[in-house]
Amino acid sequence: MAKAVRMADIAQRLGISTVSVSKGLAGKEGVSAEMRAKILAVAEEMGYQPPARAHTQPGGESIGILVADRFFNENAFYSNLYRAVLKCAAEQDISVLMEIVLPQAEKSCNMPSFLVNRKVDGLIFMGEISRRYLATAVQTGVPFMLLDFYDDAIAADCVLSDNTSGSYMMTEHLISTGRRNIGFVGSVLSTSSIMDRYLGYVKALLRAGLPIRDDWRLEDRDDRGLFIPFTLPHEMPEAFVCNCDEVAYNLVETLKRNGYRVPQDVAVTDSMGRMHGDAQFAG
């Protein structure tokens, strides 16, 4: 039996991305009319057959959610995000299947059965996942979107917080209270969200003419995305902007164990505007 032609095969023939092929076949924006014509011509030449539309029940639709294991532990943010998606789906009479992607599955790009067998009409990636895994999933041709992250190398619809502006405003608020030495907590290269929050922090400091010191940027997680103990600098800043509330809480506990009062000695805030510690500081 001849092997089924995939979007990835068409993409390889034309030297373009699988996402572009998907858009061309679906008649979506993002590819030129000339390229769309080439995609359709090559698809016909190669005998491409679009997979049958998936339905879990007559008249119903389904979506799959993929989330990396490192994000779906005790992290209240992603638990709440998942519940919000479930609520919206239920209101639209859409069923939801979820797969927690374990580290080994992410590394080996092992796709869940509901995706391989096209048991879903669409896919949501919730929280950052490796580019290789994402690219492999895209090749299935199932429509997808990204939730709480983006990837510069993959054209996709995404839903995001305005991380840069939120962090900028929080850093600016700290500056307005008279603090001039401000650090940042977050492994900047770990996720697009942390990177954008760091950029907002840097922008605020640059505009105020304040120092940006490498020793005041604390790493909060390892290459696997797992939290690590903080290494406090020898010379402490007056405040820290943390990339999320969980990290802020962990930092407060670390500061207390090391004899610092929060916020009297060191103020701690997350990038979404929440202050942490025994008391709110005036601002």
Please provide the spans of the model-predicted regions.
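Alpha-helical recognition/docking segments in bacterial nutrient-uptake
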Residues: 1-2, 60-172, 230-239, 246
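N-terminal helix-turn-helix DNA-binding module of bacterial transcription factors
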Residues: 1-58
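Short beta-strand segments enriched in small/hydrophobic residues
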Residues: 13, 23, 56-73, 173, ...
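Short beta-strand elements in bilobed, periplasmic/extracellular small-molecule ligand-binding domains
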Residues: 89-101, 198, 202-226
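An alpha-beta-alpha
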Residues: 168-210
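Short acidic capping loops at alpha-helix termini that bridge into adjacent secondary structure
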Residues: 180-181, 212-216, 262-268
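Flexible loop/turn connectors
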Residues: 228-283
